[in-house]
């Protein structure tokens, strides 16, 4: 039987399995049992959008690395489906997986023990595993691999898959499934994970023939890393894992509906039109997002040639150095005043690798209302989805920038671009509305803690975060110099992301300084991953900004709900004068050094100690809960609604 997939553009026609057919009800599967008669279900098309990473082993033809692969099996030697699956991962260059075993996936784990090249980093929860795989992928550009068992193991991956889908992160998730004969019978630990994840994966597969494993794995990696990166799920029934077979590694991929829609290189005429608009403008601004992360060199050259200031989305941080004089840092709801001012007053908005999401635009009709808009993105579905551009290019931002840079270099004398007056105007805004914070006695402003960390690491650390106030402060006050330094759940906003993401980043970058800047609410959601950090001896540093509250929700309570507290206090109401829970004891239980700091004057030394201590370390920084993330444009608001003053000490 052919492998079942979730998307109609991919061919379902294949030779029937040579293995003994099993009596499976046609009502129990999310696809038609007759290849010539596809299911009448509506299928979601495969998404293609802004590139985040260079494709890794994704060319349709075999690469030299795959050609020279040496198998530990003789070519005609039968082996289990699980061993075929693991070897398929090896052939894709996989060196690390984040896998938690269970009844329906233990065959895969047994096969992993027979691999001499793949390391399994054992998370303490499947959500920790998928977030760690994301951290690995986001920090390295390579696809992250996570493995879970059927039922609750698979459903525990859902938040991570949705997160990777929204942020365009290349993931391959492999799940065990109940044996084929039990599918649809409500068997123990059975969930229809293909159906569950249909709308939060770029594509997914239910493997129904052991012979299809080599092709499916190759396709999964190609889909995850080409076009718009994203998560792909491969669901493998246990009897498929146990079945003996001789793999055919030369099977071609069958992705006609996908391959035909991959964007072509941008046309010279389109790029020339954009250069003409630049030459005619007086107040241009760059608006760059996650789709520009793989184009930082080309973007830097473009800015050098044009002198156009750069504003970044949360996902785009690091694509252009935040400490450069032409950087406006982040725009949007909690972006800098000067970045939002630039967009508000621009006459040309160059939107590269972005999707005009609500946290950036606020009220769509008012966003960049005076500007001509140029939108370059590799996903045709994103162009015109929220904001209609005057000029659009559906293609790779990297190729578009390379092409425009050539045009600009060839026409430099003719164009003589000079936006000095505009840059001076924006410099005045920087002087007038800098990112700032207030100090109250000995209390530690959370912004100051991040500022000190930036100074002591010289802006070279890889930073992961949870979600909330600390996330926004980390985006504002740490100056990212390069892409892939900033790892954060941007589109989904998943709390609990920071700690496991730091694990993945540390595994992918063993020589890097990796710091999880976290809040007490987010941190405790995946606190069990401290055990993984200790067992794997990963030098992850945790800068915990602890205010005993759900800070961002509390900020909205202060501003819009008359400070009425609705379950945002995370401490013990019976012991409000004590820090609860004691995060140091969590660290101590896992054998991780930890310390607490409560006074501003002691903070710098405490952070330096954290950085100097070999291995992992947790620093519990006690912060006042009254702090607000500013600037702030209320949801659905415009630049005119920007809030720059106040905190929880004021009544509104």
Swiss-Prot record:
What are the GO cellular component annotations? Answer: chloroplast
Biased composition range(s): Polar residues? 1-20
Give the E.C. number(s). 2.2.1.6
Tell me the cofactors it needs. Mg(2+); thiamine diphosphate
Q: Gene3D superfamilies in the record, alphabetically?
A: 3.40.50.970, TPP-binding domain
Q: In which pathway does it act?
A: Amino-acid biosynthesis; L-isoleucine biosynthesis; L-isoleucine from 2-oxobutanoate: step 1/4; Amino-acid biosynthesis; L-valine biosynthesis; L-valine from pyruvate: step 1/4
Q: What is its main location?
A: plastid
Q: What binding details are noted for the cofactor?
A: Binds 1 Mg(2+) ion per subunit. Binds 1 thiamine pyrophosphate per subunit.
Q: Where in the cell is it found?
A: Plastid, Chloroplast
Annotated region (Thiamine pyrophosphate binding), positions in chain: 469-549
- Which EC class heads this enzyme's classification? transferase
User: Residues annotated as region Disordered?
Assistant: 1-23
Tell me which Pfam families the record gives. Answer: TPP_enzyme_C, TPP_enzyme_M, TPP_enzyme_N
The further comment given in this record reads: Acetolactate synthase is the target enzyme for sulfonylurea and imidazolinone herbicides.
Q: Which family does it belong to?
A: Belongs to the TPP enzyme family.
The protein in question is named Acetolactate synthase 3, chloroplastic
Record the organism.
Brassica napus (Rape)
**Taxonomically, what lineage is the organism?**
Eukaryota, Viridiplantae, Streptophyta, Embryophyta, Tracheophyta
